[in-house]
């Protein structure tokens, strides 16, 4: 009888260990997905601000139907937001509307604080902003 009880205790410990491991994995996946969704939401908001800049006349501090002025540095990002990072990610301009003429796109990237699907690098989401639309894709 003592041996049977010992086997039941060992079996119970194994089952609890497996349940804890599965729970941790599910929590980690959920945290990654939540971070990815939050970054996507922030990027769509920044894309909307970039489109507002595009449409705003140059006399009012906008682009005058161009993304020229939204540069890859802090000054370019400051035209879209005064907070280049938040609890979700750090944001940057990955391809700017810099140069002369009419720049037709700008690309913004968010680097999250959770590990992405590859298991080693952070979540990364990218948005390409056009004059009247945007395209979002998840890089990790």
Identify the residue ranges that each predicted region occupies.
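Glycine-centered small-residue hotspots that permit tight backbone geometry or close packing
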Residues: 1-2, 95
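Membrane-proximal amphipathic alpha-helices
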Residues: 32-43
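N-terminal alpha-helical signal peptides/signal-anchor transmembrane segments
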Residues: 42-58
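C-terminal juxtamembrane segment of a hydrophobic transmembrane alpha-helix
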Residues: 4-32
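Periplasmic/extracellular, small/polar-rich flexible segments of pilin-like filament-forming proteins
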Residues: 55-140
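General structural signal for alpha-helix termini and helix-helix connectors
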Residues: 29, 33, 56-59
């Amino acid at each position: 009888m003592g041996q049977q009880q010992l086997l039941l205790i060992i079996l119970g410990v194994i089952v609890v260990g497996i349940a804890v491991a599965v729970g941790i994995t599910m929590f980690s996946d959920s945290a990654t997905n939540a971070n990815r969704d939050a970054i996507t939401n922030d990027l769509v908001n920044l894309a909307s601000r970039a489109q507002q800049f595009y449409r705003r006349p140059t006399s009012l501090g906008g682009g005058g139907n161009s993304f020229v002025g939204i540069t890859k540095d802090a000054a370019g990002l400051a035209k879209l937001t005064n907070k280049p990072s938040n609890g979700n990610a750090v944001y940057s301009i990955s391809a700017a509307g810099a140069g002369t003429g009419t720049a037709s796109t700008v690309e913004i990237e968010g680097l999250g604080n959770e590990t992405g699907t590859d298991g080693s690098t952070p979540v990364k989401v990218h948005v390409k902003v056009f004059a009247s639309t945007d395209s979002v894709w998840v890089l990790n």
